Regions:
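Peripheral/terminal regions associated with large enzymatic or DNA-binding modules
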Residues: 1-60, 64-364
Length: 364
């Protein structure tokens, strides 16, 4: 497997340190550093750096942290899934983040990306032929976001990327050369250490179709519906959970009854005191729906397998990681800095009550 770090001269020192620490092959510099911001321009250099003798090529962006054995982890996963485009980071507030969170709760370690959102591109490994095809596809494009063009490319091929649910790659900082700073703090949906990631990536189950996906953005709950990519807007619109309920088979009455019966007043009050009552209710309903869908996905996945597969404690920590990010990810970007360790623990405890209620929920 060959590799490269995408970077810009303003981050050259940071990129060199990352490449040296991870044992990556070299740097892919923006060929027009004084031009308009364009991740795609640098991505073309990075994917062109693939070694023709390699079977796969890994491209990592410069604003990440990752374990020293990242190349080994990625290489083993590429051996397991030799024909797949593999993605190793997912934003905690994206639709694909919602898919990853749902997959973690269902007991899966990989999930198929949704077709109506960008493909997270902080750390991507492609088979060499796919990398060549992507470069040919992207040549001459006016798109400046490589993550957006990846999704257009994968949709055209009829197969989206495969996302690693345990995130060993983490985004660092809030600055953005490509204009994403307004999104605020952007972190991994399921932060996982390398020791836990190894059995998950090597032997964990794959969730190909998560069904409808609950996710939060700007303090509100939404649902990504099955097949919404076929809509007139390509599925890029956002459906509030209440508007989307009729397409899920659930009713508002059933949701309100579950809230009345299961939402703990003490924790709800504490979350409301810090972030407002509307956010507290939205977070609990979001996690209720998440628990419901995770239970459905777990049933479709079936028995987790023999004890020699992924250790139960590793799967439990992955579930904890997924729930721990639900609260801060759901906050509006300007309020995420208010979520310190105490607030994260509070929101996590609150979210777990909803997830467990959803997992046991049998709406009439």
């Amino acid at each position: 497997m060959s590799s490269a770090v995408m970077t810009h001269p303003v981050r050259l020192v940071q990129a060199r340190e990352l490449a040296e620490r991870l044992g990556l092959d070299g740097l892919a510099l923006d060929p027009e550093p004084d031009g308009p911001p364009s991740a795609m321009r640098t991505a073309m250099v990075a994917w062109a750096a693939a070694d023709s003798a390699a079977s796969h090529h890994l491209v990592v962006q410069d604003d990440v942290s990752a374990p020293e054995n990242l190349v080994a982890l990625v290489g083993r996963a590429a051996g397991r899934f030799p024909d797949e485009a593999l993605v190793y980071y997912t934003n905690w507030h994206a639709r694909n983040g919602g898919a990853s969170r749902l997959a973690a709760l269902a007991g899966a370690a990989w999930v198929r990306a949704v077709p109506d959102e960008f493909t997270p591109s902080l750390a991507v490994c492609l088979p060499l032929g796919t990398a060549d095809d992507f470069r040919a596809f992207a040549a001459g494009s006016d798109e400046r976001h490589d993550d957006e063009l990846f999704s257009v490319f994968f949709r055209a091929r009829g197969r989206m990327s495969l996302i690693a649910v345990p995130n060993v790659v983490e985004h660092i900082g809030t600055s953005s050369i490509n204009g994403h700073a307004t999104q605020g703090i952007r972190l991994a949906v399921c932060p996982t250490d390398a020791a836990d990631a190894e059995p998950l990536l090597a032997r964990g189950r794959v969730l190909e179709e998560p069904g409808w996906i609950p996710y939060m953005r700007y303090g509100e709950g939404y649902i990504r519906l099955v097949g919404q990519e076929n809509g007139p807007d390509g599925g890029r619109g956002h459906h509030r959970w209440l508007d989307a309920l009729p397409m899920t088979g659930l009713t508002e009455r059933a949701v309100r009854e579950a809230v009345a019966e299961g939402m703990p007043a003490d924790l709800a009050t504490q979350v409301a005191e810090r972030f407002g009552p509307a956010f507290a209710e939205e977070l609990w309903i979001h996690c209720l729906l998440l628990g419901r869908q995770a239970a459905e996905a777990a049933r479709r996945l079936g028995d987790p397998g023999s004890p020699g597969e992924v250790p139960p404690d590793v799967l439990a920590r992955l579930r904890d990681a997924a729930v721990s990010t639900a609260g801060p990810a759901g906050l509006p970007p300007e309020r995420r800095p208010e979520a310190g360790p105490d607030e994260v623990r509070l929101m996590s405890a609150f979210a777990w009550t909803a997830v467990r209620a959803g997992e046991q929920w049998s709406p009439a």
